[in-house]
Amino acid sequence: MAKEEKNLHVLEENFNQLIRERIQKFKNLQEQNKDPFEVYKVERTHTSKEIKDNYETLDGTDVTVAGRLMSKRVHGKAGFSDLYDRYGKIQLYIKINDVGEEKLKEYKSYDIGDILSVSGKVFKTRTGEVSIHITDFQLAAKSLKPLPEKWHGLKDPDLRYRQRYVDLIINQDVRDTFLKRTAVIRAIREFLDGRDYIEVETPILSSIAGGAAAKPFITHHNALDIDMYLRIATELYLKRLIVGGFEKVYEIGKNFRNEGIDVRHNPEFTAMELYEAFSDYNDMMELTENMLAYVCEKVLGTTKVIYQDTEIDFKPPWNRITMVDAVKQFTKVDFNEVESDDEARKIAVEKNIELKKELKDCTKGDILVGMFEEFCEHKFIQPTFVMDYPVEISPLTKKKRGNDKYTERFEGFIFGREVCNAYSELNDPIVQRERFMQQIRERELGDDEAYMMDEDFINALEIGMPPTGGLGIGLDRIIMFLTNSYSIRDVILFPTMKPSQQ
């Protein structure tokens, strides 16, 4: 242990010495009136990609590029370097005959991580690499701290998330992940815009946290002197817009839930919710599978993705199964034959399932859901719609046609994980008020995730909402599948982290 601490101290001292040397170089530049932070703009003519893609027409042409110096192999009177911009790498070649002795000396003093603008002629080396023969250059920003050489040598496993800016510089695969994230969201917008949906923005701060069973973040509005909540879902505001006559609406934005953090959950996450008048949950199933297949084709060129060594195919149609049939398939218990809450409670004891409230307070529906979560959901690897959830846990959903113990609700599962949730939306204001009152009773029993009463939403339903289908998708989880990312932190640029002690 003492030897390890000594080695760590030596590494830290060497690192600090490198910083001191870089700061001294910066001071020297200031004394020469070459302060890089006095550079306000770089007039670059091309990116690295444009030069490589158009080499045949640009060969011998003067260009100006800009980016970060990531390697330097300059010895004696000439040498090569690598400059990285948003699109990738371009090789640079510098020679004393072209820039002069003083400029070459200055160039040699630059450090890995410095930001440069470089002018020169496009050419191809004997090995066939498209490069720039430097005729002029300028330091556009000085890197005062060295970049880590390789992430696997770092002691803090969370440093990639805490210093995402460094992670993006070092790791091309990380940059690719977030470029795909952007492409996924763009493709979803294209799909919905092409079907005449209207993108809207609804409040993030609200006096009522509604639309989902979740624990909200609470804040206080000083001027109004009221507690307010960060939204946990966009549902109730979007339904108000359906009432207002916007027949197809969607929103992509942040939701916030004051709950645990793990590989699938971040307190701040991105969701897409949409609502369509005169449709039901069957329409939402069809829309979901078609939209996600479209996104896969657009971003990856195929509906098949490899996730954690498993091939997943997003191609429609997805599998469909009711929750009752899923439980019957994997546990041999048929809840269609269970006639009372007491009988269901006996099954819960026999199966030793974990429930979210006291057994005596659980209904048949609560126990059905507990059985599904315990024994079934992890079984659905290929995209599957699990349909017809109990009415007890679906307060915003219409009852199932022909069986009022269940609702017209489905959740989509991929690789054993829930990725979406959809309903035939409840539009009866009298029933909705009764459902909210039941949720209030659940809250009084200690369920701090139960829904709050929302009188204005009831008022909107009383004005009249047409039959409506609604869908919510956790975009971070979809992006995890399309980028083969194990943790949700790998697809969120700046995930929620406990403050560093350093």
UniProtKB/Swiss-Prot annotation:
Query: Pfam families from the xrefs?
Result: tRNA-synt_2, tRNA_anti-codon
Assembly information from the UniProt record: Homodimer.
Similarity comment: Belongs to the class-II aminoacyl-tRNA synthetase family.
Q: Please state what the protein is called.
A: Lysine--tRNA ligase
Upper lineage ranks? Bacteria, Bacillati, Bacillota, Clostridia, Eubacteriales
Quick check: keyword Ligase in the entry?
yes
Naturally occurring in which organism (per UniProt): Clostridium kluyveri (strain ATCC 8527 / DSM 555 / NBRC 12016 / NCIMB 10680 / K1)
Cofactor remark from the record:
Binds 3 Mg(2+) ions per subunit.
Q: Which cofactor(s) are needed, names only?
A: Mg(2+)
Indicate yes or no for the key word Metal-binding. Answer: yes
Catalyses: tRNA(Lys) + L-lysine + ATP = L-lysyl-tRNA(Lys) + AMP + diphosphate
